[in-house]
Amino acid sequence: MTTEDTFETAERAAAIAKAAALIESLPWLKTFHDRIIVVKFGGNAMVSEELQRTFAEDMVYLRYAGLLPVIVHGGGPQISAMLDRLGIQSEFRGGYRVTTPEAMEVVRMVLTGQINRDIVAAINKHGPLAAGLSGEDAALFQGRKRGAVVDGEAVDLGLVGDVIGVNPEAVLAQIDAGRIPVVSSIAPDIDEPGQSLNVNADAAAAALAVALRAAKLVILTDVAGLYSDWPNRDSLLSKITARELRELLPGLESGMIPKMAACLAAVDGGVEKAEIIDGRIEHSILLEVFTQSGIGTEVAPV
C-alpha cells in the first residue's frame, strides 16, 4: 500500500467516524425538535474566552438543529470583581452576602449591561440570533426579598430575593421570532414596585424552565457532576431520581445545594429532565444533548 493509499484510508476512516457521530445524534434530534431547553450559563465557562466561544457555538448549533435554547445567567465572580474595582466593600452576615442599594446598582450594571451583552455578542457572531433580556423586562421574573436565619436570629440580606413567579411571554415572543433569549437573573420586587432584587440564577433558570414547559434544564458547573460521597471521585452519579435526590440533598456540599435544589424544583414542576454538567469541557452542551451516554448527572422524575 502506498503512502497515498494509507492517507486516503485514514481520511475515509475519519469521515466514517464523523458520520457515526452524526447518526448517534439522530434520536435526540427527533426527541428535542421544536422543544425548549433552558441552559443556566455559569462557572468557569463565563470567565474563559475559549469556553465562552464554544458555548456560543453550541447554542447556535442547537438552534439550527431545530431545538429552542433559552439561556439564563448569573455572574457572581464578575460582580465581586466590579465591587472591588469600585471600592465598594462587600458585607457578609452569617456567611451571606448583603446586597445594598449601592451594590444592587453594580449587580444590574454587570449582569444586564456587561455579561448579558457579551453572551449576546458571542452568539450573534454567527448571525442575528440572540436577544438579551433582563428578568425585569415585562415582569419576566417576580421576586420577593429573602431573609436568612443565622444562629437563631433573622438576618436582613438587603436586596436579595427569591423568584416566586414567572411571566414567560417576553421569552416566548423571542422564541417565536426565531431568536435565542438570554436572560439575566434580576427580578422586580413585587412588594416594592420599582425596586430590583438579585436572585439566584440556578433557581431562576429552574423557575423559567417550569413556566416554559421545557423538555430539559441544563446547569453548567465547575465539577463533573453530583458525587454521592464527595470528595470520593468514584461516587460520581450519572443519574438520580427526584426521590433519591430529595433524600441526599441536605447532606450535600454547600456549593452544590442550590444547583441540585434547582434541578429538583424543575422536575417537580414538570420539566422532563434536569442535568448538571461540567462547563469546563468544550462543547459540553452538545455532548450532553446529542450523545447516548451524555455527561454529568441527570435528575429524572422517577
Swiss-Prot record:
SUPFAM superfamilies recorded: Carbamate kinase-like
Cellular component, GO annotation: cytoplasm
Localization per Swiss-Prot or TrEMBL: Cytoplasm
Class of the enzyme per the UniProt entry, highest EC level: transferase
The EC number(s) this enzyme carries: 2.7.2.8
Pathway of action: Amino-acid biosynthesis; L-arginine biosynthesis; N(2)-acetyl-L-ornithine from L-glutamate: step 2/4
Top-rank taxon: Bacteria
Annotated site residue numbers, Transition state stabilizer: 40, 259
Biological-process GO terms, alphabetical: arginine biosynthetic process via ornithine; L-arginine biosynthetic process
Protein's UniProt keywords contain RNA-binding: no
CDD domains: AAK_NAGK-C
Keyword Secreted applies: no
Positions annotated to bind substrate: 75-76, 97, 198
Function: Catalyzes the ATP-dependent phosphorylation of N-acetyl-L-glutamate.
UniProt xrefs under HAMAP family: ArgB
Entry similarity comment: Belongs to the acetylglutamate kinase family. ArgB subfamily.
PANTHER family: N-ACETYLGLUTAMATE SYNTHASE, N-ACETYLGLUTAMATE SYNTHASE, MITOCHONDRIAL
Protein name according to UniProt: Acetylglutamate kinase
Taxonomic classification: Bacteria, Bacillati, Actinomycetota, Actinomycetes, Micrococcales
Gene that produces this protein: argB
